[in-house]
Structures are given as C-alpha cells and as structure tokens.
Amino acid sequence: MVKFEKVPILGKESIHVGYDIHTDMVQTIINDCRSSTYVVVNDTNLSKVPYCQDFVQELRSSLPEGSRLLQYAVKPGEANKTRSTKADIEDYLLSKGCTRDTVIIAIGGGIIGDMVGFVAATFMRGVRVVQVPTSLLAMVDSSIGGKTAVDTPLGKNFIGAFWQPQFVLVDVKWLETLPRREFINGMAEVIKTACIWNGLEFERLESNAELFLRVVNGSKVIKVNGLSTGEVNDIHYTNIEAMLEHTFKLVLESIKVKAEVVSSDERESSLRNLLNFGHSVGHAYEAILTPQALHGECVSIGMIKEAELSRYLGILSPTQVSRLTKILAAYGLPISPEEKWFKDLTLQKKTPLDVLLQKMSIDKKNDGSKKKVVILESIGKCYGKSAHYVNDEDLKFVLTDETLVYPFSNIPQEQAKTIVPPGSKSISNRALILAALGKGTCKIKNLLHSDDTKHMLTAVQELKGASITWEDNGETVVLEGHGGETLTASADPLYLGNAGTASRFLTTLAALVNSSSKQDYVVLTGNARMQQRPIGPLVDSLRTNGTKIDYLKSEGSLPLKIYTSTPFKGGRIELAATVSSQYVSSVLMCAPYAENPVTLALVGGKPISQLYVDMTIKMMEKFGIKVEVSTTEPYTYHIPKGQYTNPPEYIIESDASSATYPLAFAAMTGTTVTVPNIGYESLQGDARFAIEVLRPMGCKVEQTANSTTVTGPPTGSLRPLKHVDMEPMTDAFLTASVVAAVAHDNDTDSANVTTIEGIANQRVKECNRIEAMSTELAKFGVATKELPDGIQIHGINSLDLLQLPSNSTGPIGIESYDDHRVAMSLSLLAGMVNYSKSHPAADIKPVRILERRCTGKTWPGWWDVLHTELGAHLDGAEPLGYLSGKKTKRSVVLIGMRAAGKSTLGRWCSQILGYELCDLDVLFEKQYAKGTVKDFVAEHGWDKFREAEANLFKETVEQYGDGGYVFSAGGGLVENEVSREHLKKYASDGGVVLHLHRDIEETIVFLQSDPTRPAYMEEIRDVWERREKWYNECSNFAFLAPHCSNEKEFQHLRKSFANYITAITGNREVQVPNKRSAFVCLTFGDLTEKASVLPSIVRGCDAVELRVDHLAKYDSQFVSKQLSTLRTATNDLPIVFTLRTKKQGGKFPDEDYTGMARLFDVALKACVEYIDLELTLPIDVQYKVSNTKGYTKIIGSHHDFGAKYPWKDPEWENRYNQALSLDVDVIKFVGTATKFEDNLALERFREEHKSKPLIAINMGEIGKISRVLNPILTPITSEHLPNSSAPGQLTLAQINKIFASMGGITSKKFFVVGNPVSHSRSPVLHNTGYKLNGLPHHFDRFETDSAQVVKETLLDGEPSLGGLAVTIPLKLDIMKYMNQLTDAARVIGAMNTVIPLGNHHFKGDNTDWIGIKHSLTSNGVPEKVSNVAGLVIGAGGTSRAAIYSLHNLGCHRIFVINRTVSKSIELRDSFPQEYNVVAAETTQQIDHLNEHIGIAVSCVPADKDLDTELLAKLERFLHKGKHNSFVPTLLEAAYKPDVTPVMKLAHDKYQWQVVPGRELLVHQGVAQFEIWTGAKAPFQEIFNAVTRD
C-alpha cells in the first residue's frame, strides 16, 4: 500500500497525495477551511460516480453545527467552460446567500478546476477554493499552481486569474473511473515533467510502460447504482491497484516537479514556462484538431517536434529523441500527426504549415511576433532556464516531411568538419541477435537508434530472448541474454515496418523459439513495401531443414507464420545467396543452436556482398563461436553447436554506408570531412568507398586504421569513374551515383560516363534503387542507363547544366521511395543545383525532397548534421498538393463484368467530366499489334493475358492517373492479384475505381448472345460469384445500372449517372439545407414494388430516408437495387441512408457490426447524400464510417424512446459533445414528450446548441409541436404511406399549416401582372402548390399594361406582397423599378419575376431560361453538355432566354436563324463574345458547317407557317441533329397548340425528340414558386393542374 504524502508549494504543504483518502480530504476541508458554507461544484458526469457520491455524503455528515453544504452541477465538456457558465455558478452562489467566508470545492478535471477556480478568484473579490482533481491531467498539471480561466470564442483560457487554492487534494483512487483514452492523455504531462526535470523518474517510467498499458487497456465499462437517484449508470473502471505503486509514484513525482517550478516562479515570468515544453507546437495542433484530439495527445506530438528542433539545432542527441519517442509510443500516445490511428481519430484533418505557424504566433510565451520554444538539452534537463527564440524556417523544417535544399554555395571551401555517423545498422542488428542468444550481460554502445533497431529490440523483448535496460542516459543498451533458453512465441504478430535486416534475421531466430502454453507459432509482418521484398530463398532453406513456415499473403514475402513446434534440425543446409547476404548471416548466427552442427553451403553462384558474411563470422567469434570456412567446398561454412558468451562491452562501429554521405559532401563541395571511427580495419565493406570511389574521382583521401578524411577538389572538377565493381559495398552505389552526376572530364568521346556494376541486389532493397536513381537523376537533367547488375551515369559537363526538377506546372519534388539511402544521397545532389549561378537570394529556387523522415531508418539526425554541422541552408515546405488548391483531374477506372454497362456509361462519364475515354482492351490490342484480345488468349492463354493486362494497367494508371481519363477495364482484370493490388492502391491514393454492376440474371442473358469476346471457360454465374468479392474490395465506388428497355428509361439512367459521377469526383457537393426543409421516411420492404407511388410520397421533400433496417433482405445486391430504384423514381432526390438498430427503435440486429459495416460500405460506394450514424454504435464503427465518408454527409443520431432523459439531462450534452468530436455534419436528437413542457425544454436546448445543424424533435402526440418548430430536415410522413415510421409524425402540409397558424409563415399575396392575363395559368400553377404544401399564400391576376400602376398599387401599396410574375407588355418597363437585377435578367434584357427584398426594395429575375433548361434536362439532355452546338429559331424576347439557357448548359456554339436576318445579327451582337452566338444568314453557310446540333429551341409563333427561307435553314440544321450521348432534342416555347408545325417537322421527318411548350410554362413557374417560398414544388401535381384542360 502506498503512503500518504504532502508536497510543499509556495512555502505551504497544501498538496496532499494518497490513495483512497476521502476521509483525510474531508477532515482537511473541515478543520483547515472553516466556513459557514461549503459549495461542491462538479459536472453532471461526475455526479454518477459512486466515489464522488460517497465523498459528498461523508463531507455532508461531517459538517460542524452551523455549517451547510451546497452542491451545483454544471454541464460537462470544454464547450461549457465559458463566461456564461461562470455567471450561472455565480448567480447560484448569490441566490443561496453565499458570502466572503464561502469555501468552494472544485471536484473534476481541468475544465472544472480552471473555471471554478476563476469563480473563486472573482466571487466576492476572492473566496477560498479547494481543488479535488479527478483526472490524471488535472492531478499533475491544471490543479497545481493557481492558474484559472474560462474560454472565449477567440481562444482557450484567454480570461482568467492566478488564484492559489487552499489545498489540492489528490486521491489517485479517482483514476479508477477515468476512461482509457483520458488516462493515456494525462500521461503526456507526466512524461513531460520527467523529461524536463527528472531523468531518474523518466527511467522509471520507461521501465513501467508495459505494465501501465496492460492495465489501462484492460479498462472496462461497469454498471453502478446512484445513491441518491437509484439510477443505473455506466462508468469506466480500471484496476488501479494492479499498478498502484507505479501510478502513485508517477502522480507524486510529476506534482513535485510542478510544485518546485511554481514555487520558484509563480507568475510564469521565466522558469515556469519550462513547463510548456511540447506546448508551443502542441497547442497549435490542438487548435486545429480539437475536439477530436485531446490536449495530451497534441502535447505528445508537440514534444517530439520540439525535441527534433533541439536535435536540429545541435543541442539534443539523437538518442534522447529516440528515448522520448519510444516512451510516448509505449504509453499509447501519438508521436506524429500522420500516424494512421491518430489520423483516423482526427478524421483525416489536415494541419497546414501556415496555420500551425499562425497558431504558434499567439502563444503566451512569445515576445510579440517572436516565437519562443522550450529547448531540451537531455532527458531530465532543459537548455537554459526559460524558453528560447526560434525562427520560422527551423520550425517549418521540423513540422513537415518535405524539405527544401538550397544551393551549398554558402559553404566556404576551406571548411573542415568532423562528423560521427550513427552506429552501423548491419552491426547493430547482428549485435542484438548475438547478445540475445548469448549468455550474460553485454553493454552495447553506439547502437543505432533507428526504426530498424527499434523493431529488433521490440522483437527480442516480445520473444523473451533477453532483458533490456539502458544506461548513460539512454546512450548504452544493457542486454542480459538468456542463452536462447527463454525464447517463447509471442501472442501478437511482430510488426517490423520496412526493416529488411530485422525480418531476415528474425525468420531463422523464430525457428529457435519455444511454444507458449497458448501458441505454437510466430508471425512476422511489416508494411506494404516489406510485404513485397523477397525472403523466399531463406524460407525454402529453412523448410528443407524441417521448419514449417507458411506465407500468409504473397508467396516469397512477409507476412510469415513460423511454427515453433518444428525444430531447427541443422546438419547440411543449402542456401541460395545471390540476392541477399542477410539470408546467410541469419542462418550463420542461429546455427549454433540447431539440434545438430550446421554445414552451410551457399549455392547458385557467387554470393552477393561477401564482406557482410565475413562481418557476421568475425562478430560471432567475438561472442565465442568460431566458424570454419570449408577447405574443400567453395562458399561453405561449418558452424559448431554451442552457446554465445556475451562480452561485457561491445562498441558498434559507425555505419560505413552512412559515412559515405558526409564524405561525398566534401567531394562535391571541395571541403574537408573526417569520419573518426571508420578506417581500413572496419568490418564493413563500405569503408572502401573513399579509397576506391572518391580518390579516383579526384579527391584527396587519408585513411588510417580507424579514421577517414576526404578533401574534395575545386567544385565542379570531379572526374568520372570509368568502371567500378561495387559488389563489396552495394549500398554505397547511390552515393557514388550522385557524385558521378556532377563529374566530367575533357574527353569529348567519353560522355562523362561512370559505370557501376555488381549491385544487382539493390533492386530488391527498400525499393528498386537502380530504377529509383535513374528516375530521379533524370529530373536533374542527368542521363542514365540501367545495366543487368548496375547503372551508367552520364555526368553533366558543368554544374550550370544541373536542372531544377520541374515540369510544365512548375517545380516538382524528388521522390524518396520511403528509402533512407535514396533520400540522403539525393539531398547532396540537390545542393549542387544553381551552385555556381549568381542570383539574388530571393530568386534562388531550392530543390524539394519528399518524405525526408525516411532517413530515420539509419540516420534520424542526417538533416540536422547537414544543416547544423555541414552548414547547408534548409527549409520546411508545405506539400505541393496543399499549395496548388486545385482539384486534380483524377482519372476514373471502370471495372465490372461484361455487359455491366462499361461501354455506355464509360462514354457518358467521359462526356460529363470532359475526360478522355480509353478502353484498356483496345489499348492492349494496339500494343499487342497482332489482333484482338481473343487472338492473344488463343496464342498464349488466359494466365499470360492477365499478367500482361496487369502490367499495362499499372503503367497506364501511373502515367495517366492524374490526366483526366476514363479507363474502361476488362471484366477479368480483378482475376490477377497484382492487378487487384494496383486497383486498391489507386483507390487508396484518391483515385476513383468505380464498379459498374447490374442484375446478374440480365447479364447472363446478354453475355450468352455476345460472340465478339473470348468465351468464358466456365458458367457466367460462377465467374460472378468468384469475382464479386474482388470487385468489392478493389473499388471505392459502385453504381448499379438497371436494364433499360426504352429511351425514357435511358434518360433517367443517364441523369442519375450524371448526378452520381459528378458527386464522386467532387464536382457536386451536398449542401445541408439552411432553411426549413423536410425528408420523408420510407419503411417498405421492397421499393421496386412501390416505384410508381414514390413520386407522390416524396412530393415537396428535400430528401428521402430509406429505412434499410425495414427492407425484406439485407444482402448488398438487394440494397443496391433499392437505392437505384429510389434514385430513378424520385428524380435523384438526396437519400438519407438509415440503418436503425433495435435498441434505437429500429429492426436491425444490435450486435451485427459486420453486417452493419458491409451495408454502410454499400451506402458510401453508392455515394448517398446522408448516412444516419447512431451515436450508440461502437466507436470503431463510427470512426470507420467517418473516415471513409468521402462526399457523403453524416447525421449523428440519438433516440430516447422511453422518455428516460429529459432535455436537461447530461445524456444529451454528452451525446452532443460526442457528435462534435466525430465531426458529424448534422446532429439528430429524438426525445419523447410526456408533457408539453418537454417541447419548451427542447427549444431551450436547441437555442443553446448551434455549433452544428441540429434536428431536434420529440416523439408522440404531445411532441408534434416540436416537429413543427424544427427548422431543418424534419422527418415527415405522407398521406400516400400506409402508416408513419414514428409516433407523432406529420405530413409536410400539416406542419406548414400548423406553423402558419402560429405565425411562423406569414400569408403572402402574389400576382401575375400584364395585359392580357385573364387566361394566365399562373394562378392555377401557384395556388395548387400552396394548397398541396399547406402554405397560407394566394396567387391572383392583376391586369394592366402600365408599369407605373404596378409600382403604385402593388410594389408600394401591397404590404403583404410576396412576388410578381411579369408578362407582356411589362417585362422591360418594370425593370426601372428594380433595385437589383440578377445576371439572367441583365443579360437577357427582360424580366418575368419580381422578388421582394424588404424595405420596399425589389430584385428582378428571369426564370424563362430556367424553364427552358429544366424542360430539356428532364427529357434526357445532360445538365452540362460537351461538344454540342445549339440552335435557336427566332429572334424575339424568348430567344434571348433560350441563348442564355443553352450557354448555361454548355453549348460551345449557338446558332440563330430568323425570318429577318438583320434581327438575328442584332441578337447575336447583343450577347457577350464568349457565348459564341452565330447568325446563320444563308443556307449555303449552313451546308458548309461541320457541326452536330444536339439541342434546339423554337421561339417563333406557332400559329403561322414558317417562310420558305427560314424553313430551308431549319431543315438543314435538323438534318445535322446528332449526339451520341443523348437524343437530339427540340423544345417548343409556345404553350399552344400541343404539337406545333416545328415540332411535327423535327419529330416526324428528322426523328428528333420534341418537348411541348407546356413543360416550359410549368418549369418557369415552378422556378418562381421555389424562389418565392423557399419550398420544393410538387411538380407533377402542378403540371397536371396547369395542363388539365
């Protein structure tokens, strides 16, 4: 049991720390803070915690006579840490007669402590306060030191005071109920205080991380009974007692640090700002990522960034950064904003560099605009006594993963530097394996602290191979080996990142591992690249020797499952070693522990990298095992059985491969660099680099047994190396390549060629390094040629010829391929660009290196050395994608079965997006050049075709993925695993992979009659069933294309597909309504049976809800068909996809999370406009949907069917905060009204919660009024539905009538004005809409030919005027009375709509053009056309609206014909030039046109015959009617007769589709209706009413 401790602060022992000390806390308050009134303030969540209830009860029962206890609960969450909440508390205190002797007890986390402390500081000019912190963060940070504050809209903690509490009573028992994430969040501050002040405590924290995480991860939710209410509540429970000593100690030590610092600097003038380590950067991240990211999580990232800054400035060692990184990760905290789990948690939010710097600029530590950061000197010690000024350039560097390298021309040639590279990766990994297998304690010094060795150390610990501790402030690893006796299978897979060395060494080591009681295998896995790298020869060898190993994914690569029940037998082992020497070293090191002595024979030719094999043998000898080289067989070794004996100390040589970079820097810049611990006695082959590569190229090289010094020749005078065999030092070829790029001689015949060979293994390293260097050197203007086992580099003749990497759009980045050696070598070449050019500093363009952090694999501090020690000018850079701000034209890949519609929809897709269409089968046939796909299959077989098809797809999508193409792929592309990987990668990188599918029965019927394609070798249904899962896993979108049997159905499909494709490509965004709106709820089992009635059901709605849980079947194909049916039947009304679970009032099984995830995936691929996401679902389900939502909006919903939670209950506040943290787009709360006052409480809740659009309603008869008052997306029913989906639902008309009766909708009067208007259909049109929608308005006629009369009588004289429809002769005359004109009215030059703006101001509009457009688009013309010309017949007023409309549709040219040619010319000249209006003057002119006319609008009188000349022109144009994506369409502007002569001619003689003028009449009136009322018009009912006679 831990003891009770008191910690002094500011000269008083006022901080008490213990476990289960509530009695001591009560006595301290009663005895040392005597008062007539004690006030406990906590949040409503804490009121549910039994320990809080016990504490308050004990305090109440212990009160002395004459004292009273009050308790006040505030709403939880940062959103309530406001001046308003503070005022509420103060009003409560005043109402209860609290005076100056009041003692306030703040029980809670930092929010409560900060706010209640501020109340105490100001109430009655200051009253006493006792802090009782309940969160880890509050215990160790916010409760200590007297800082108090509330938030403001402009920032957190901007208003507050220093007010020291009487006591801080810290009982770690509170932590039992702290949620897991909050617990881990608090550890950031604990680690921070140890990091800046207490190195010993940091070490203790390091050694207890595993225990902490195990206990905290075991946190669970339990049910407890409330003492006062009897309610059963869910709370978190963590078994603190399982780590009590550690928890108590970490809290106590952290408090001691803060107390000591505060005592020295209470008001944060100097020393106290050291406590802000990690906060300068952390607060900037928090400002962007809140509320998804917690304070401690952001501070954790901030600590890493600020530590990296310290390292970058040459103050902090890389080892110390590594220790900090490890401990934060070990306690479950993020170490980078790019970690996948953290990105998912923060919903993929971006953290732009300029925003981070701007947020940092308002840090309280700053001096004006100068930023200050706490600099760490070592673990446990800060650099100086306060924060330091830092410049933006250095900050930008550490904040980004892209770096700008400026020319090295600032570096003086006489510069001489000594650089010590980190420990050798090769030696470090070997030493760890040998020491883990060895017996005894070994102190390993100069170990490389990198990703590779981190994975190796973790694996050794997971396999229980050794005990690992640290000395010398983390610089020395102390490894106590157990002689291989304790090796045990780990429960979890060993993740090795991209650590190739670790993966190969551990593969053989795993064969020595013992089975545990629960597991008899070890799984090795890694990242995506690691899962492509070869390990086959080693696995083959071990399998042959008796070890059972399974490939879990791809043959020949990780992940591997290595069975521990099959022993490593030993004896003769044959191994192919032409790919990697690491296979050899892996077997060599483990061979002494085989059952029998090992004879290792390397077969298949000369082994690669023999020197690394020699290195392993020498190191084995140091650990006590001597390997004998066979004298009778080449490349054969005899290894005896035995056990390694660990030497007391082993010093790792610096990495010779890494040493090549500073030495090459000297060579290229003409400076001098010494590497003091690598010479000719080195174990590493790369130590030869200076002698064998740099010296022949013109450098002065001095090498001793243990040091190497290089002095470069004058800059620009390096010589090519005609030929070098780099087989002994293959990793150094990249460095040699960049040196060769700037090498030239005076021999005109040599072409400055440097030939490097012996490096074939470099193709299977972290990337294909030979290809990577060839690709990236080309960006600098350096030519190369790949050789079978090497590369030729054609050096440039002058440094001036070295190019800045760029393309037609500007500078581009240098790719690193996630390869440390690629990045480091190319950083040297980058500094030589513009080296000798004299430009003003502002004009010098740097070279951008991408993924700079990949150097962490072997030299995390490389950039620090390049900048701080070698003097290079570096800067950080925002990723180019952030900077452009442009939408890229990401190509669309169509996949799916034959006959799924890829050809037709592919053509439509290309036209809608303006992309190029490319059929991959056609492209294949072009490249094959010997016939069709069918011919290729006949000659080579399907497997060869699939292989060739995969290569073609990879090359095509890599080259043209951003080029704006629609790629139509063959149905079987997904049959090939390589193709599937490329498809998935393209989708994950932001490309569109669209699966087109249709009913399989229809597909079978079609395919059985298609002779043009190679025949399936099996049943079509079997093919579909095999491929279906592949189509699903490879695609990120899916569209079901129903079979179309007539032109009308094709029109519906095309329109639906156009809406879909523009949505998934980001060209059409879902707009959440900001006005009164509604959606109808559908609960049918099968919509296909109700398709005919759906248009009536959704009348007047802004969206339609599909209750998927009510469907007859939940299979994906069925649900997809329902969505397709709904889209078609409702004219693509936005869909709300709702999967309501049983406990939230629906029918879907509560625990079927797999089925739920599958159906949400269907919805997201279908790009539904809204997904209803229940806030009670598991967090992983919620985050999966939130992180993959794409362009879909999320409605976060919560329902209370049992009337369990009044609107004041914290349940709603907690759910609201949860919805905010999920960053949903709309919040939907549904309560149940048991009394009318519940509706008033709901409205108060709505008024106080405006951060997000909120749907809030009460169910039941009493709650109907809440549906009327709800402002957006109100769920409604319809008179055409058999029943409503929820109790109390109303129709849209009912809602509007009730709302109008309450004064919510003011009755308006509307008129049609002009002369004559007696036969106008406008009153019928509008009044029908008002009646059906339940609106209180009335539309009438006002006949006059005087605009003046309209102004006096209606514009000035009618107070309830809602709008005017204007007809002849007033369309021009009334314009002078308008205060504003829309663009349409201005360009057309006439108006037909008056819109009141208030205060006797009016806007003039013209909806004729909308009527024209909607008449066309509702009959199959796309919303946007491409390569289509339009025709307008006539030159009157309607013709102007027609031209405006055709231009809006996208017609690239608009022809006008008219009886009087001069009128056509006059019309043409009145429009802007970009409209491209052409007056067709003669028939001969038309004959010579090479245009296809797709759309025509007839604006000539329908009651007169066309004159001969006009008719001749019209017929010529109609003859040119053609468009391959829609039927040529003519709209008649005249309302009567139903069929005009122009319509008859176009339809009967030229097969045009014709649209009667009544559609134009209704569409333009409906546009007016929606402008005036803001409501959706019931189009079909209005159309029927208008055209009835």
From Swiss-Prot:
Nucleus is among the record's keywords: no
UniProt binding sites for 7-phospho-2-dehydro-3-deoxy-D-arabino-heptonate: 125, 141, 147, 157, 189-192, 258, 272-276, 279, 295, 364
Binding positions for ATP per the UniProt entry: G896, M897, R898, A899, A900, G901, K902, S903
Protein name (record): Pentafunctional AROM polypeptide
Assigned keywords, A-Z: Amino-acid biosynthesis, Aromatic amino acid biosynthesis, ATP-binding, Cytoplasm, Kinase, Lyase, Metal-binding, Multifunctional enzyme, NADP, Nucleotide-binding, Oxidoreductase, Transferase, Zinc
HAMAP family reported in the protein's UniProt record: EPSP_synth, Pentafunct_AroM, Shikimate_kinase
Annotated stretches, region: EPSP synthase: 405-872
GO molecular function, one term: shikimate kinase activity
Location of region: 3-dehydroquinate synthase: 1-392
Positions of the UniProt region annotated as 3-dehydroquinase: 1082-1294
Gene name of this polypeptide: ARO1
Main location: cytoplasm
SUPFAM superfamilies: Aldolase (SSF51569), Aminoacid dehydrogenase-like, N-terminal domain (SSF53223), Dehydroquinate synthase-like (SSF56796), EPT/RTPC-like (SSF55205), NAD(P)-binding Rossmann-fold domains (SSF51735), P-loop containing nucleoside triphosphate hydrolases (SSF52540)
Similarity comment: In the N-terminal section; belongs to the sugar phosphate cyclases superfamily. Dehydroquinate synthase family.
